Amino acid sequence: KDLVRYEPGVSVGGAGQRGGISGYNIRGIDGDRILTQVDGVEIPNGFFNGPYAKSQRNYVDPEIVKRVEILRGPASVLYGSNAIGGAVSYYTLDADDIIKPGKDVGARLKSGYSSADDSWLKSATVAGRSGEFDGLLHYSQRDGHETESFGGNNGTGLARTAANPEDVRATNVLAKLGWNYNDDSRLGLTYEKYKDDRDTDQKSAYGGPYFNGAPTIPSSVLPGGMYQWRTGNDTITRERFGIEHSFALDSLLADNVKWSLNHQIAKTDQSTEELYYPITRKVLRTRDTIYEEKQWVFDAQLDKAFAIGDTDHLLTYGTTIKQQKVTGSRSGDGTCVAVGRGCTAIGATSAADVLAKASDFPDPTINTYSLFAQDQISWNDWTFLPGLRYDYTQLKPHITEEFLNTVNADGQGTVSDKNKTWHKVSPKFGLTYALTDNYTWYGQYAEGFRTPTAKSLYGRFENNTTGYTVAPNSDLEPEKSKGFETGLRGNFEQGSFDVAVFYNKYRDFINEDAVKPGDDQLTFQSNNIKRATIKGAEVKGRLNLDAFGAPQGLYTQGSIAYAYGRNNDSGEPINSVNPLTGVFGLGYDQDNYGGLLSWTVVKKKDRVDDSNFKSPDGVSSQFKTPGFGILDLAGYYKVTDDVTVSGGVYNLTDKKYWLWDDVRGYDSVGEASVTQPANLDRLTQPGRNFTINLIWDI
């Protein structure tokens, strides 16, 4: 979240939810529609299908990141499927980022504390160079607890407003080895392993399940509810092996060649343990969910510079070949802790609570083959940027015994193992015109697409306890988008600014929360929204006040982001669009110290589609977040050339507020009522909190 705290039109959600952050939101598009990658390798999608199966996207440690690139709007020309709404690219540290000029060895030690989650960071990076070889080794560990809410009620169930207690440990290892065997040639090896392990006492679920703001079984009949207590463990791991090779090639076809091969294994293990007491029996019940993605990615990129007449060209072209294998399962057990129906003795197995290993989708293998080309053409004050990409995607479902256990549980439904294939040509055209040395106008048209997931095509789940079913839809069409953007950039001695206006059209938008009409019970089946639009504007700028006689180093900056979304099929708003947001700051920078006072202002959320909303608190409509304004103060001080202290105090006025990304859609279906009922105060952001970091560059 800190990476995009001041970025217009970009946010991160996930407060109060099990598993951590849910991913990026860019211009009203979020989740798996935003491609997130580390060194060109995509991190897994999020997954939710049933009360104990919800994965988030906590796969990246910011301590290894040297640079982040955020691409707003459709980006399929560069990245293919899943970049329909934008892309976030992380680039990891290299030896040159740690070794100081003129030296062959370097190190960076860092320690930090955050009061919002009572977490301590310990990080160490060492790097060295010898002749043609260089290497880097990094290890970081963050130990903390739950991120606080503004609520102070430490009770249980719907009454609880404090965050659920958590113990969190996140670790990351990064190792790199490079061989510069020529001036323009390099061979590199990379190994990375990230792990996020958190234990949660889900006190907000005690006493459930809930319906219309009260326990399903009244507390006068069953004190403590069916769920007497519940704890959970979420372990997220991501391991990557990579090789990268770049070299100069003085030929007619290319000046430079760069290729890479990466293998990544990412896995989410979720385990839930609860004391289950449905009056007739008392059982210690466990539920285990596994979601895993394995992928191989080969990328090759070539570039060639040449001139034709008065135009200069930089042609970039290449290919991407990717294979993803996705597996998932859920299972459970029940052990009697008292004699009752189905429990003949303490310690015996409760057959009614045993969940045979099952899967909600057939394990897919997804093969993607891509070709792309882009030409940067410079002519006088004009720059043209045409691009084209072709993607062929094949999804092969693999019918497993675990999936058959789900499909055949009630003897209904058919199973299809038919392959799905999609072809897509994605064009892009951009141009810029230098009006003067200081001002540049630009325009862009780009297309994007996203293929349906195996879960939406084949996924099945039935929960008779809470009365809902998830049904497959094998007729889903891929999502498609067309994005138009124009803007003006200015850069001059007194400051800079960037103004952008965008209009994005979406076809066949996949709604995974759609309610299937005509069924006796609540049935969710993904469908295509034929047409949707999101339009908006963003402004970002900085003014150097010292150019107008103020003290040297004093500046002001600001950004405003506005977006408007509409489901053109129903006329309803698109809930993933955030309210109008502005961030304004006054800063002061010197060679060895500086600070920034920021004021974040967010308008109340007034356009909401709550036609399918159900709340465990008994509220009939979606909660609309009120507007708010908060102050943050951050600063740094270089004690010596090698030692820097930085920190900040956030929410200075200790204000209670909600972020729309955290609140929207947190309804009674699935996780909200069964595993974590949502008292709205528990979804608030922390009150006044601070961070402090000490960095020593050796």
Annotate each language-model stretch with its function.
Residues 1-100, 204, 486:
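Acidic, small-polar-rich N-terminal luminal/periplasmic segments of exported/outer-membrane proteins
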Residues 46, 449, 502-507, 554, ...:
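C-terminal beta-signal and adjacent terminal beta-strands/loops
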Residues 96-97, 104-110, 114, 121, ...:
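Periplasmic-side early beta-strands and strand-to-turn transitions of outer-membrane beta-barrels
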Residues 184-252, 266-278, 284-292:
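Flexible loop and strand-edge segments within Gram-negative outer membrane beta-barrel domains
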Residues 195-197, 203-204, 267, 394-408, ...:
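Surface-exposed extracellular loop regions of Gram-negative outer-membrane beta-barrel proteins
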Residues 219-250, 360-366, 416-426, 430, ...:
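Outer-membrane beta-barrel signature, preferentially recognizing the C-terminal barrel domain
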Residues 312-436, 462:
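Signature of Gram-negative outer-membrane beta-barrel scaffolds
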Residues 378-384, 393, 496-510, 517-610, ...:
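Gram-negative outer-membrane beta-barrel transporters
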